[in-house]
Amino acid sequence: MANITAALVKELREKTGAGMMDCKGALNETNGDLEAAVDWLRKKGLAKAAKKAGRVAAEGLVAVESAGRHAAVVEVNSETDFVARNDGFQAFAREAAKLALNTDGTLEGLQAATFPGSSETVQEKLSNLIATIGENMTLRRVAKLEVSKGVIASYVHGQINEGLGKIGVLVALESEGDVEFLSTLGRQIAMHVAATNPTALDASGVDQAVVERESNILREKNAGKPDHVMAKIVESGLKSYYKEVTLLEQPFVHDGSKTVSQILKEAAGKAGGEVAIKGFVRYALGEGIEKEEGPDFAAEVASMSR
């Protein structure tokens, strides 16, 4: 039997919102496999079906740089928040984001680019910064968006300096409409993305392995139902899931009575042309490494737009 530690039980509780004894039982049933325990609890109806809470432990900065119809976002990690507030570290993150605008959008391409004002590559500059400050740092990831017509809107949450913060979002709006209107709308949608963390633009973009996992959970929770009933249950359950995780189907943070898709349709008349989201990127600092975000994060972002 696996050693079920208090720390493992605590982590499962934080992921699912289930009670302590239920979490212990789930871990015992799954031999200490955390992900299997999450599914076990959901099949028993003891855990929320919502996405896992974003938990991060890495410090550093997310930097955003935009220039009209193209923009980039990078994440640079450090060991401590103290270093993230260092002028040299911030200057590096900002320059890395600017450089990313003119690269191929890959991490390798950015690392190999020449750092402004020197003969060093970006990676060499970072290595020298590590030696100077005395703390390990990593250029973790980069993304770039472009549109031929329209705007790339951006938003930085937890901003500590211009374009630098804890969460960076880019939203590509494709349209021949009024640029000023599109910029305002794009920023609102970027704030929405920061708050709700959608995993895909629409249902077609959701990983099929995830869809199958959700379908299996629905089937096991409703085992014994006739086939025709089960099919409707799975279909309905997936529709609800897509409303949680796909950007176009989510209720708009700034007006919960409408979905993002409905907001875009209404925007066409005001913009003077159809408006479509070509893509979006959301980088949260240290995503995937342990540290809990505040419980009222969505409300916090929404309140900032009022």
UniProtKB/Swiss-Prot annotation:
Record's subcellular location: Cytoplasm
InterPro entries linked: EF-Ts_dimer_sf, Transl_elong_EFTs/EF1B, Transl_elong_EFTs/EF1B_dimer, Transl_elong_Ts_CS, UBA-like_sf
The record's region (Involved in Mg(2+) ion dislocation from EF-Tu) falls at 80-83
Recall the GO molecular function terms of this protein's record.
Answer: translation elongation factor activity
Q: Which UniProt keywords apply?
A: Cytoplasm, Elongation factor, Protein biosynthesis
Gene3D superfamilies the UniProt entry points to: 1.10.286.20, DNA helicase RuvA subunit, C-terminal domain, Elongation factor Ts, dimerisation domain
Recorded GO CC terms: cytoplasm
- Summary of the function given for this chain in its UniProt record: Associates with the EF-Tu.GDP complex and induces the exchange of GDP to GTP. It remains bound to the aminoacyl-tRNA.EF-Tu.GTP complex up to the GTP hydrolysis stage on the ribosome.
Homology family: Belongs to the EF-Ts family.
What is the protein name for this chain? Elongation factor Ts
